[in-house]
Amino acid sequence: MKEKLREPIGELVTGRDPDEVTVKLKKLIEEINPPIVVAVGDYVSSKLHEHNVNVDIYIVDGKIERIEKSIDLICIKNVYEAVNEAGTISPSAAEKLHELIHSPEMWPAVLKIDGEEDLLGLAAILSAPDDTIVVYGQPKRGAVLVRVNEDVREKMIKILQEG
């Protein structure tokens, strides 16, 4: 499964540096005008926040490429916690994420993960309504913008089933 997930699920956004990537992401998100934007990962979340991109749900674990890092999302008052072990999607984390996605009164929100958040992008794609944007980092390459629809969900289910 990890090999399949190393390839971008959506549109790979690249640039000379992280700021250029973030500016491109911001433009794409504004053009699409999605009902929900979910950012997965500390670095992507911090860059989108720094560039004032309207993100509804940030999913973070306090680490960037497995190294403890503190990011500044202090202005987000709605912070929720869940446990998710590395390489898994725990039922409790998936349920909390599902609740956040379907509760706009809780936005903007940070879902702080004790463990690892990487695979929760899959849970976001499976839970989110059509046209939701899920953004996650693609280390050393840029960021990936996924526009959720039934085809993307089916692809994720197939990857999970094949394990």
Predicted features and spans:
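Short, solvent-exposed amphipathic alpha-helical segments in soluble enzyme
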Residues: 49-57, 73-74, 125-130, 149-153, ...
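Gly/Ser/Thr-rich loops at beta-strand to alpha-helix junctions
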Residues: 38-46, 114-121, 140-141
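Internal catalytic-core helix/loop-beta-alpha segment
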Residues: 79-119
